[in-house]
Amino acid sequence: MKLENIDKSIQKQDILKGISLEVSPQKLTAFIGPNGAGKSTLLSIMSRLTKKNQGILSIKGREIESWNSQELAQELTILKQKINYQAKLTVEELVSFGRFPYSRGRLKPEDWEKIRETLDYLELTNLKDRYIDSLSGGQLQRVFIAMVLAQDTDFILLDEPLNNLDIKQSVSMMQILKRLVSELGKTIIIVLHDINMASQYADEIVAFKDGQVFCKGTTNQIMQADLLSQLYEIPITLADINGKKICIYS
């Protein structure tokens, strides 16, 4: 996935300015930065939920506007930060929604097979008949990831999926995402507010500030005290623990 000079403004206010970057395939890339930096807006543009004002966004060498909706939904999926659900659905029913780009609502045997594989992969089979409104926050988020995985796309975009999860649930979620990359070859782009989670689990980091790319590189390149202090405008020092850099806030 490649972005070239992406601009976005809303009511004459610049939200994104000249965003250019290339997402490495089969890696977990974290978007970090202060609130209002444009991370979630860019994720929406990358999934074509929000229109860009100008610039070029291409997936596998094709401009995103040239993909029809069904084609795009078989290549890329996004899980937004806020998901509204009102229907009384079981875990299995919600996961089955991921097959819509293929089944158009008429599930075939191969769709059910993919659903079963996904439930098993994420250890949700024992919960498949539970109603989603009876699940804990961590269980529910795992079910949403299962729905995304059932869609079977190469690109997975996640907007702050750790929100409302405790530390144990957050670690479990990040471990799952790392497995999707290492075992299934997925390309994952995730918006994170916890820099230390990015340090522990991301392969690459793109930092945003004031609607622009502030810096980008491997996790080791970005986890530098001076860069992060400038990014967040607070004093940050780093500690090296078991080969991983951890932020300490002054």
Regions found by a protein language model. Give the residues of each.
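Conserved structural motif at the start of ABC-family nucleotide-binding domains
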Residues: 1-3, 16
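The feature captures the beta-strand-to-loop junction immediately N-terminal to the Walker
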Residues: 32-34
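Helix-to-loop junction immediately C-terminal to a conserved catalytic motif
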Residues: 47
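Conserved ABC transporter NBD signature motif
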Residues: 55-63, 72
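Conserved ABC ATPase "signature" region
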Residues: 96, 109-127, 152, 157
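Conserved ABC ATPase signature
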Residues: 131-135, 139
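ABC ATPase nucleotide-binding domains
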Residues: 231-250
